[in-house]
Amino acid sequence: MPIEIVCKIKFAEEDAKPKEKEAGDEQSLLGAVAPGAAPRDLATFASTSTLHGLGRACGPGPHGLRRTLWALALLTSLAAFLYQAAGLARGYLTRPHLVAMDPAAPAPVAGFPAVTLCNINRFRHSALSDADIFHLANLTGLPPKDRDGHRAAGLRYPEPDMVDILNRTGHQLADMLKSCNFSGHHCSASNFSVVYTRYGKCYTFNADPRSSLPSRAGGMGSGLEIMLDIQQEEYLPIWRETNETSFEAGIRVQIHSQEEPPYIHQLGFGVSPGFQTFVSCQEQRLTYLPQPWGNCRAESELREPELQGYSAYSVSACRLRCEKEAVLQRCHCRMVHMPGNETICPPNIYIECADHTLDSLGGGPEGPCFCPTPCNLTRYGKEISMVRIPNRGSARYLARKYNRNETYIRENFLVLDVFFEALTSEAMEQRAAYGLSALLGDLGGQMGLFIGASILTLLEILDYIYEVSWDRLKRVWRRPKTPLRTSTGGISTLGLQELKEQSPCPSRGRVEGGGVSSLLPNHHHPHGPPGGLFEDFAC
């Protein structure tokens, strides 16, 4: 029967001390190589932190009233800083801006703006044919009758051409323009370009941006001065009211840049007959801020469809393009004044579909035709004044000159004088009132005032948090190792087979039966080499 003998081996104290010393030296060496391997505690960190008051509130030392007061002071200062920081952040997120005005130095030459004018009456009564009256009945309110005064119910007219009707029946500038001068030089109807608006056939002076006329001086006599006959005898009689019925007499005028199409039915101003109207202009160059400070449209954000038919983006061009898309989608045609090559709407579609579509469109931020302002814009500020004309002497003179009576002169003649107040332009620029650099500066001032901190202090706190977190993760990831032997003090318990395998000495006998004489206590054999090493076997 096999016998298992368990022995206890006790090493001499002289053998253990050098090993402990060696292990201690190795541990000291590792500690010198990798200092701070274990994270610092909060008290140690607080005593070395540059955050004011943290060392006195959380540092090493006894807990007492003094430390409590310091902790309250630290928390109060921290709360005050957070309150101020929240207010600064809210102010920054509102994106405030201011407007700076910089008057420019006088220039020797200034580009004269484009001047668009329209007679308020769209169709001349004498120029309307029977077919025109028939097709325009819904627009003009005139009853469709033939030349004998009978209703033209059974007549068949050719399909109307709205462009031809407007071009043929609109007021002709050659008949209205009685005199024209620009900067002391004579001008004529040939210096005007035909343009179509909601008022029909209109005319624009100085329309071409490639050959813009210059103005070399400010004040009256250095701009455009024209005398017009509005031809009130050609105004349509009112039989019934329609959307196109007008009770006014005079012209509509808009002063704009050459890159901007006229939007005269909303942006124009009226000029009455019997008056000389003075319009003093001031060029204004406006610069708006894009998102998030404003809502202007930058040139880099423009898309090709938004510029279709125009050389540059403008609010007027955007509105006209949007209105055309709406009318085209609902009425399957476009109005004469809209850009594009699509089919022109006939007169009956004007009143039945197109006008209602335009009336339903809104231009507000929530409307389908909201057009943001371009970030760079040139506009012209206006100051308007007027005097009554003609006086008694000039009324008789003009009546003889144009073969009219004085009453006709007073009711139909007007003078328009457009000029620069001075050859200077105003630069108005939106600027961010509170930017990121100002926010950081204010936050730094509040941090220094309340808690005495800086960016480096925040880095210290983040570094300590990282150090503690990393140590916790290492402890979680570390797996415990199962030891091969269980040691208590200097005593180890081994089985006989382990003793045979781990002993550096060869076996001297067999463990069978009673053959155990070779396993004797150490003092029964000759002592080992000198040096104080003793091995005691307890079996």
Swiss-Prot record:
Under PROSITE patterns, the record lists:
ASC
Looking at the UniProt record for this protein, which Gene Ontology cellular component terms does it annotate, in alphabetical order?
plasma membrane
Query: Per UniProt, which keywords does this protein have?
Result: Cell membrane, Disulfide bond, Glycoprotein, Ion channel, Ion transport, Membrane, Sodium, Sodium channel, Sodium transport, Transmembrane, Transmembrane helix, Transport
- Tissue expression per record: Expressed in pituitary gland. Weakly expressed in brain, vestibular system and organ of Corti.
**Membrane-spanning residues:** 69-89, 439-459
GAS motif (motif): residue ranges: 452-454
Q: Which domain of life is it from?
A: Eukaryota
Positions of the UniProt region annotated as Disordered: 501-531
Principal place of residence: membrane
- Name the chain's protein: Acid-sensing ion channel 4
Instruction: Please tell me the species this chain comes from.
Output: Homo sapiens (Human)
Q: Which gene encodes it?
A: ASIC4
